[in-house]
Amino acid sequence: HFNDISKLKINIIGEPIIDRYEYCDVVGVTTKDPALSVLSKKVEMIGGGTLAAAKMAASFVKEVKLFTYGNEKTIKNLLGNRKNIKVINLAKNQKIQCKTRFINSNRGEKLIQSTNFDKNFFSKRDIQNSISKLIKNNPENLLVCDFGNGLFEDKLLNLINNLKTKKYLNVQTNSINLGFNLFTKYKNYSYLCLDTREWKLALKKNSLSKADIKKYIPKKGHV
């Protein structure tokens, strides 16, 4: 029931992303190269990745505790005026991945996407700091937003797998991490959110049956 949900306090851990949209008018092809020529009209910056998940959750639950990383001022600006989101910054020194999408302003079509870097690399100190903060807060439930940007590896991944708490997984495949960010690295989850391609990559199958997926459904969970 919605009234019950509105009283919930949830915990989210994941990688932040800046979704940058540059709207352009397509004016033709350049004269010296076979390249599309566009005229920039406006730019929008939106909090993506785990920031988007936190903003959506904050609109209908009592409190969101967000475990993420990056420049504090940038995170605050991207989250907007949401007083019920408490940020636990795991590594303030880490850059936030930015994905720029060039959009045909007349048709709304995406022309090309550019990403500023492929993944983050965390120092031993960053990892230990992240582990300490997660243990200290002892979350009763944990939504994991894994976009393959480097947070969920090695010791932190092992800790999450061993946490005695309900875990809800969103493990994303994209063009940069294709084939390298699979849900099979996780154990003991209560909920799993994947699309068809992500299932096929993880199970190494071109076609899927209900039986293929059934074995990965938790006894008291959902996919």
Predicted regions and their residues:
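Ribokinase/PfkB-type carbohydrate-kinase core domain
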Residues: 1-223
